[in-house]
Every structure is written in C-alpha cells, then in structure tokens.
Amino acid sequence: MLGAIHLGVLAACFVLFVPMAMAGWHLSRNKMLFFSGALFISLAVCVHLTPYFPSVSDIVASVSSVVVYDHRISCINEVNQIVWDVKPVPNPESVRRNNGSTKLDYFVKNWDWMKSRKVLSCEFQKLDKFDVSDLLNGSWVVVAGDSQARFVALSLLNLVLGSDSKAMDSVRGDLFRRHSDYSIVVKEIGMKLDFVWAPYEKDLDDLVVSYKKMKKYPDVVIMGTGLWHMLHVNNASDFGFRLRQLSSHVESLVPLTPKEQEGGGSVSGRSVHLFWIGMPVLINGMLNTDEKKEKMSDTVWHEYDRSLGESKILRQMGGPLILLDIQSFTWNCGPQCTLDGMHYDSAVYDAAVHVMLNALLIESHQSL
C-alpha cells in the first residue's frame, strides 16, 4: 500500500509540474491562461490520487474510536474511586431497644463516587432493581471464592430480588450453609447465579479449567480468595505462584476469535466479564482467635497484597480481571463497619456490587 502511494505521488508530480513548466514557457504572457491550466491539472491529479488515501469519514471514525477506547479505560481505572460517610445514628436509643441489634447498627453508612472531574465524566450511578434486571437479563453469573465472595453474592441477589422480598428470606438461609455451593435461577429475567465455595486458589483454577473443558462459559465471573490461604498455608510466595497459575488459565477461558474445534465445527468468540474480589483490611485486634491474630498480622497481610499485585492477575497490572477494591472500601469504611475485623457490613459488599455493575456497563458498551 505504501509503495502504491509513493508511486502515485511520483506520477502526480510528473503530471503536474512538467505540463506547468511547459505552459509557463509558452504562456508566460498570459498569466490567466497559465493559472487556469495549472488549476485544471492540479484538480485532475487530486482526482487520481484520492483512491490511495483514506476518506475523511474513515479518519474521523478512527480518531473517535480511539477517544472512546481511551475513555473506557480511564473509567475502568476510576470505577473504584468511592468515598464513605459513616456517622452515628441520630437516635441510638431505638437501636438499643432492638434485641437483634449489633454495633454495626449504631452507625449509618453512606457511600458515593468521588466528585473529581475524571470520575464525574464517567457518569457512574447506583443501579436499582429494574436497571440490574435489564443489564443481567438472560445472564449466567458465577461468584466463586471464600466468605467474602459469599457476601458479594448476597448483595447482588439483594439488588436483583429486592432485600425485602420473601425470596430473600430463603436465599439467606440457603446461601450461608457452611462451606457449600448454592445456585438460583431468577425466572423473571432468566438470570442464573451460581455461588461456588472455592476458598483456595487451586479451587478457582479447577473451576476455570472445568468451564474450558465443557466449552460452557458464564457471562460474568466474580472470584476472590486469599484469607483461607493466609490462615491455613501462610505463605505469600506460594499464594503468588497459585495466582499466576490461575491467571494463565483465566486468560484462556474463552476464545477471543472463532476457532475450529476437534472434529469440526467452530467456537464462536464471546465475552466473559471477569472480576476479582480484593482482600479486606484486617483489623488484627478485632480478629476472634489467637491463631488468626498471629498468622494474619499486618506484615503478612501486606506480603499477600504484594503477591497479588506481582501475580499480574489484575487488569491494572496487565492481567484479565477487574479489581473490586474491597481493601479501599473497608479501609475507608473503618472499624465501625466490622464486628470481627475481617467480615464487614453489607454496605461494603453493596458498594462492590455497584462498582462491578458499572464496570460491566462500560465493558459491554451499554448504557441505561
């Protein structure tokens, strides 16, 4: 293509300047005729060169697509930028009269996205039940991991079904059966949600490989581990190694382009949206066993956090999964948002779900 352009330009120069020079020699006394001839030849050259150059509409489309792509990346990077407003309830006496109340009930927890120019340009929003129903209509959602993942699944179902609905009463009981999987189909919108108890990275790895073998892929996968490994293995280097293994399998979870299968046929390219549930801030003095206080110290926590970053499993580090920044949320919500220094108020996981949904809107090029 480049050689054709060079050849065309060379020919154009010959066609343009040789006749102009000849015309100038013979018509130097008639400047009007000279310039008319020059203009005619120039227009003819432009007509002949036009096929070798992209159209203006192509250039504009190319530039606009780059701008949209850059804006999308910028908004994904900003989606976790939320701030918290945690205040004591105005009437603590009413909380005291409630027999089932805990320390968490004495504080009102509100959150929203930061009001910086970058964040405002992304137009993030808290979605209601109807918005989420439209977004996840007909989707297969998988939430896999430890207890943090279970709380994320609960918050998502709260939003889809309505926290006050009768369906949520049974969901809470079934979802929190100790160390078990859970599955539900929301018939009204055709959404299926699977919670997979997978407290170790190897469990997540096996899950991802199973989807690859079956050639059946969820639309959304939300996963996260770390706490069990920290408590029961207590080796940050091994944690990082396991995450790198997981990352390599997640990257090949689905074909990016149609590929031929063995025995004929093709696998159509499709998009699986992948999210990682970050580890919460651990408040050591509030942990409920001596073993946890010893093995899950601040030093160990930071080693695990560093291994997570170095594993390159996260999108911000060049990996496949978008971070749901539970670390930031729990740090900013503070000790008023936890009873045991590890598991936090539902508001934290609600925020994570809204962050995930806004990222999903960006990734799937949708708007509400």
From Swiss-Prot:
Single Gene Ontology BP annotation = xylan biosynthetic process
Q: Give compartment(s).
A: Golgi apparatus membrane
Instruction: Describe its function.
Output: Component of the plant cell wall polysaccharide acetylation pathway. Does not directly catalyze O-acetylation of xyloglucan but exhibits weak acetylesterase activity in vitro.
Intrachain S-S bonds: none
This chain's protein is named Protein ALTERED XYLOGLUCAN 9
Return one GO MF term.
acetyltransferase activity
Gene name in the database record: AXY9
The signal peptide stretch is none
| Membrane topology designation | Single-pass membrane protein
Residues modified by glycosylation: N99, N137, N235
Q: Which residues lie on this side of the membrane: Lumenal?
A: 54-368
Phenotype of the disruptant? Severe growth defects and collapsed xylem. Decreased xyloglucan acetylation and decreased O-acetylation of xylan.
Task: Give the GO cellular component terms, alphabetically.
Answer: Golgi apparatus; Golgi lumen; Golgi membrane
The transmembrane residues are 33-53
Source organism per entry reads: Arabidopsis thaliana
The record's keywords, sorted A to Z, are:
Glycoprotein, Golgi apparatus, Membrane, Transmembrane, Transmembrane helix
Q: Which residues lie on this side of the membrane: Cytoplasmic?
A: 1-32
